[in-house]
Amino acid sequence: MANKFAIITGASTGIGFELATLAAKDGYDILVAADEALIESAAQDFRQFGTSVDSLEADLSTFEGVDGLLAAAKGRQIDLLCANAGRGLGEAFLDQDIAEWRKVIDTNVVGTSYLLQKVLRDMVARNDGKVLVTGSIAGYIPGAFQAVYNGTKSYVDSFVAAIQNEIKESDGVTLTNLMPGPVETEFFDRAHMLDTSVGADPKKSDPADVAKDGWDALMAGKAAIVSGWKNKIQSAVANITPNAVLAEQHRKMAEPGTAE
């Protein structure tokens, strides 16, 4: 119980897996969660670093799933939260199944907002704690053939910036937005995007590099970090580019059948 305690969501693979690895290496006891059974084997990997590791398979798109995650903390003070759980979805919006696009919104928007509200209340009350949220530079770009996902990340990016302002008097609490671009993870397979230009691109970011960027920014108390120099340029250009142009550019990356 002497170690600090961290919760990392979406930790079975990708960025979340790498964030959990960094937390365990840094001496945090961790509770890791994901919506798949693979989280159990991921937890085994994290135990090699000698801290306490608990895992939970949970649907964090629901209030019940988030409540179950917090209950699994067993009353321990949450010193660090990596709110990384997210869901993608490609293809044309009109062709998407309603249940699938609603799951994206419920996971990325509803679940993330609820988890942050529950955790940040306690952190702000004691004026101590760290939260890293996985947003995306996709939030700056109208996502043709990825419309719902990009819309949810626009919400996350804006939401985090707003909450940072609301809690600015709590100088002991750090809230950081990690904004990567395309990352080499299972995301594109799960989002039905392997036949797209961006899904097939072999030059996507390494999740370990993205996680390290986010971790370093969090520990330095930064408000936000865009991971990767190409993504920094893209996010900056997006602020001065008309939406119609951005949407057409995104279409070329995300339209099904564009993979080379």
What are these regions (language model features)?
Residues 57-68, 98:
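The beta1-alpha1 cofactor-binding region of Rossmann-like NAD(H)/NADP(H)-dependent oxidoreductases
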Residues 12-13:
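Conserved glycine-rich cofactor-binding loop
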Residues 165-229, 240, 244-247:
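SDR active-site lid
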Residues 26-42:
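Conserved glycine-rich Rossmann-like NAD(P)H-binding loop of the short-chain dehydrogenase/reductase
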